[in-house]
Amino acid sequence: MKIRCLHDWNVSLEEAADIQRTLKGMLSFEFPAKKVSIVAGVDVSFPQKNLGLCVIVVMDDTLKVIESVYHTQEVHIPYVSGFLSFREGPIFIETVKKLKIVPDLFFFDGQGIAHPRGLGIAAHMGLLLEKPSLGVAKSHLFGSYNEPGRNKGDFSYMYNKTGEIIGTVLRTKKNTKPVFVSPGHMMDVDTAMSLTLKYTGKYRLPEPTRQAHILTQRLRKNHLLR
């Protein structure tokens, strides 16, 4: 899979913010007409202080897992809100290189454009891959919204400070906390929401990222990271 090199990773926070603002202008919000049949879910965690683990699970349109890969490496960039992709991006890229199947779409456990500078990890990584991407976050980072209804499929839009729609607050399971869905690259707001619902079963989170998280927990439990 082709991965574009658009910037350095070893940069200051000020430089990272400038990179985010620049890359934001390169995003496309047009979803390609090609049918989505193979999707990937991404989960990044830190089982040890300076050890990162990235898991990618690839599924077909029946939600069957057809490939899974993982990669570990040392990560010495600390977590700073709004700069997650600079901490997790390099390990994600190394994990993507292990894939034999090329997904049509990537789901990320994180933000797309619902981000202070419009470039969360889903948008950032989608741009590097030139692949459709979206973020489904468990918690709110940026944007104003009203609480959606309590039933599955209820939603409200998220807005940035200028009133532009940047995502949705989506109820994926009745009477549970909503998720925060925003487009990454080659994606629009409404398609991101409909795809999230399509790939969400009886649980709160979409199956691609849920299965990636399950594999992460299995790897850690089985001590495969030692």
From Swiss-Prot:
Pfam families, per the entry: Endonuclease_5 (PF04493)
EC number: 3.1.21.7
A GO MF label: RNA endonuclease activity, producing 5'-phosphomonoesters
Binding site residues for Mg(2+): 43, 109
Keyword tags: Cytoplasm, DNA damage, DNA repair, Endonuclease, Hydrolase, Magnesium, Metal-binding, Nuclease
Gene Ontology BP term (one): DNA repair
The protein's required cofactors: Mg(2+)
Site (Interaction with target DNA): 79
GO cellular component: cytoplasm
Subcellular location(s) of the protein: Cytoplasm
Function comment: DNA repair enzyme involved in the repair of deaminated bases. Selectively cleaves double-stranded DNA at the second phosphodiester bond 3' to a deoxyinosine leaving behind the intact lesion on the nicked DNA.
Family: Belongs to the endonuclease V family.
Name under which the protein is recorded: Endonuclease V
Lineage: Bacteria, Thermotogati, Thermotogota, Thermotogae, Kosmotogales
Designated gene of the protein: nfi
